[in-house]
Amino acid sequence: MVTIKVNNLIDFVAEVFSHSESSPEEARRIATYLTTANLTGHDSHGVIRVPVYIRWKKTGNVVPNQTPEIVVDTPSLAVVDGKFGYGQTVTPFAVRTGIEKCKKAGLAAVALRNAGHIGRVGDWAEMAAAEGLVSVHFVNAAGSLLVAPYGGVQKRLSTAPYCVGIPRQGQDPIVLDFATSIVAEGKVLVASRGGKKLPTGALVDADGTLSEEPSVLYGPYTPDGPRDHTQGTGAIRAFGEHKGSGLAFICELLGGALTGTGATSGGRQFANGMLAFYVDPKVIDTSNYFDEEISRYTDFIRETKPIAGVESVLVPGDPERKMRAERTRNGVPLPDDTWAAIVNTAREVGVSEASIQRATS
């Protein structure tokens, strides 16, 4: 395990993307969002993605420095084509569009199509919450067959994230952000690179056997080699049986089919689609009841007596706040295999040995 200071990690990852044709501004933006995912404890959406992103750039699956385009524009609705730009570039544009429309109309919807990997969806809910807005996000990943629907063994769904953000007055927002599978694909990636092990039965093999071995999804792999989910015989399982499977299906239809990205299928270019709704609570809540009631109910939930083995009952966003404070203070821990893969990628794009050494100093 190697632990890297937050600013060092951002600087190093930004240098990797700068060496791969991203502008300095885009490179730092990508690095900051990826590192922020690590800070919140979501290592699956953090810097472990660097080798994948660079591989996608080399194969033309993602385009550096892309300018998204608004292709449908009404007072309360927009469709944004990301043109396969990095998600960390095109998604903020789409979210800002939704925020601006919502502040004028009180309610807005924005469909983002053809985006590169948009990272931790909670970032975009937090962005809206910082402007005082509630947001709901339905996301799919076209070209990313990973998850077996309830009762099946074959990959038919993406991990299809769902996210809700609720602003608080003078406090961090409440953010619920989860893949509709038992684990996100990035969690399998983390486990395959020496990180946290998968929950029992998170995967299902072609014969219906439940497993927690990453090779079920990726097939055989070497410690610092690539991971390819098309090579494994199995799939990730949907969470909550028919409920998670059903929600994933809806995310595919709204985040994928309705946005124009397309519901996921094999043999096509990867792209995230996101349908996001934005609501200004001040338009609805003219008596300022909303935030007071959130405070009351949040306290009511947290005061629940925990079962044996559980320290305390939490609400969405609590684990991320705790982890962010800890890692901001102590640095970001990365398994040796994860760091080795990132360093190998850095060398491939021409980052100097001095920069590599400086990252861990």
Q: Where are the regions that the model predicts?
A:
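A generic, well-ordered mixed alpha/beta core segment in the N-terminal half of proteins
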Residues: 78-169, 175-181
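Secondary-shell segments that build the walls of catalytic and ion/ligand-binding clefts
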Residues: 197-263
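Acidic, glycine/proline-rich low-complexity segments that act as flexible tails and inter-domain linkers
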Residues: 1-6, 11-30, 35-36, 43-64, ...
